């Protein structure tokens, strides 16, 4: 692809923030004419724009869109937005930053999506590659925007991709790709669960290796899709499976589960997916094993908060959808009462999957936020409060040694917090104050 294909072209970037700024830097280097649109009056990152970048805030500028040679869309904006559809109908190409990245990337790409676990698997595979001595670039929907990884001499890219990012990606040819699982999420954006799944399935297009979850048939590619070698992981009876507390690749044991820092059955399945991806990309067994031994998981993902009260306080604030909370509750080892904190913005999700799991005599649900009332109706053993802080204040005098307080909200945080990290940090602070 010619280096100067964007020189002098009018490029409209819709949406600023970290990703938008990475697009601005990319096109500035290509000597394009850049204009930025953001529907917010004061978008994050506005102070980093140079004077030669045209800026329109507060709305979508249709005149600018229609004058573009190329539109680069933030994943936060739906393709169905009327102004974007008008531009598409006028013959203007609309892409996302991942599409730009894959057109330029020179090293193999491992691509990871799924409703839950994708950040864990992305960081775990990256750890395996590092342990194998491979110079690896990790980013996408986690950490660093993909375009910022270019021209750094990386030998392998590991990308976490959201359904929103995949909607505007057309040229991905991953070395290895996976959909870890599919459960309802973003129902405020998609017409149905099947539309959401269809967006995820785009990750498999022209992939050399496709890794599917045999415990979740929704992760299987469509018959019409052009995919390469199919590999399978599952709890039992798959190429990558758990046998006698060992993670196995075929007939070979890779590691005993008690040698891993990651805990929980859901994380063992995440580890199986990571092993399958790593092997498909040619990461050696030593790197895979050392990665599994060293990797301790992500902040806000089933993370124990250190306290000295004998109560297990667990921050799972990254559980922003129902499937993630289901994964946290399945097989949870409990000796006392579980005080479960649920709430936030459910994004139109169906909470009924939680009903059987929370209707247990040893579980008390404290429900808060925008969808707190709907969540409280799942069980008679629930308490409805306005905020997470109120919930913890009520729980504090009740907990005793052997109990667990679990923040696994099954909802996004944006109704009461800036992001799930802020929610998790507040939980950790309140947990330590509770002692």
Swiss-Prot record:
| Record GO biological process | cell division; cell wall organization; peptidoglycan biosynthetic process; regulation of cell shape
- Using the UniProt record, give the first listed, main subcellular location: cytoplasm
GO: which molecular function terms? ATP binding; UDP-N-acetylmuramoylalanine-D-glutamate ligase activity
Write down the EC number: 6.3.2.9
Q: Where in the cell is it found?
A: Cytoplasm
- GO CC, one annotated term: cytoplasm
- Reactions this protein catalyses: UDP-N-acetyl-alpha-D-muramoyl-L-alanine + D-glutamate + ATP = UDP-N-acetyl-alpha-D-muramoyl-L-alanyl-D-glutamate + ADP + phosphate + H(+)
Keywords attached to this Swiss-Prot or TrEMBL record, sorted alphabetically, are: ATP-binding, Cell cycle, Cell division, Cell shape, Cell wall biogenesis/degradation, Cytoplasm, Ligase, Nucleotide-binding, Peptidoglycan synthesis
- Main enzyme class: ligase
Residue positions binding ATP: 114-120
Q: Which domain of life is it from?
A: Bacteria
Pathway info: Cell wall biogenesis; peptidoglycan biosynthesis
Q: Which Pfam families match?
A: Mur_ligase_C, Mur_ligase_M, MurD-like_N
UniProt lists the family membership as follows: Belongs to the MurCDEF family.
Biological function: Cell wall formation. Catalyzes the addition of glutamate to the nucleotide precursor UDP-N-acetylmuramoyl-L-alanine (UMA).
What is the protein name stated in its UniProt record? UDP-N-acetylmuramoylalanine--D-glutamate ligase
Species: Haemophilus ducreyi (strain 35000HP / ATCC 700724)
The protein's gene is named murD
């Amino acid at each position: 692809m010619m280096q100067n294909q964007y020189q002098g072209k009018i490029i409209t970037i819709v949406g600023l923030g970290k990703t938008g700024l990475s697009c601005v830097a990319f096109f500035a280097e290509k000597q394009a004419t850049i204009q930025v649109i953001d529907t917010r009056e004061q978008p994050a990152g506005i102070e980093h724009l140079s004077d030669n970048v045209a800026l329109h805030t507060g709305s979508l500028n249709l005149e600018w869109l229609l004058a573009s040679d190329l539109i680069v869309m933030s994943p936060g904006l739906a393709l169905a937005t009327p102004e974007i559809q008008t531009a598409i109908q006028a013959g203007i190409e609309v892409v996302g930053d991942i599409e730009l990245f894959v057109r330029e990337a020179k090293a193999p790409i491992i691509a990871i999506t799924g409703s839950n676990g994708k950040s864990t698997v992305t960081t775990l595979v990256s750890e395996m590659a590092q342990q194998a001595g491979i110079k690896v670039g990790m980013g996408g929907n986690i950490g660093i925007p993909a375009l910022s990884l270019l021209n750094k001499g990386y030998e392998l890219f590991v990308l976490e991709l959201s359904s929103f990012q995949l909607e505007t990606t057309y040229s991905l040819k991953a070395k290895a790709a996976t959909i870890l699982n599919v459960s309802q999420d973003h129902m405020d954006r998609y017409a149905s669960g099947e539309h959401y799944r269809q967006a995820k399935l785009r990750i498999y297009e022209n992939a050399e290796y496709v890794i599917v979850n045999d415990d979740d048939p929704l992760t299987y590619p469509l018959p019409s899709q052009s995919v390469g070698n199919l590999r399978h992981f599952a709890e039992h009876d798959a190429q990558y499976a758990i046998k006698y507390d060992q993670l196995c690749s075929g007939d070979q044991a890779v590691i005993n589960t008690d040698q891993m820092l990651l805990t929980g059955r859901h994380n063992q399945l995440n580890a199986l997916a990571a092993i399958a991806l790593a092997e498909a990309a040619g990461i050696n067994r030593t790197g895979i094993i050392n990665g599994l031994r060293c990797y301790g998981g992500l902040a806000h993902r089933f993370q124990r908060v250190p306290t000295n009260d004998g109560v297990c306080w667990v921050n799972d604030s990254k559980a922003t959808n129902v499937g993630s909370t289901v994964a946290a509750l399945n097989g949870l080892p409990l000796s006392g009462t579980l005080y479960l904190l649920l709430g936030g913005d459910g994004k139109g999700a169906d909470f009924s999957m939680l009903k059987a799991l929370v209707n247990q005599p040893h579980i008390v649900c404290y429900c808060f936020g925008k969808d707190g009332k709907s969540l409280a109706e799942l069980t008679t053993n629930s308490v409805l409060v306005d905020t997470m802080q109120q919930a913890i204040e009520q729980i504090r005098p009740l907990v005793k040694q052997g109990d667990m307080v679990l923040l696994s909200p099954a909802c996004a945080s944006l109704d009461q917090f800036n992001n799930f990290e802020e929610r998790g940090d507040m939980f950790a602070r309140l947990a330590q104050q509770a002692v």
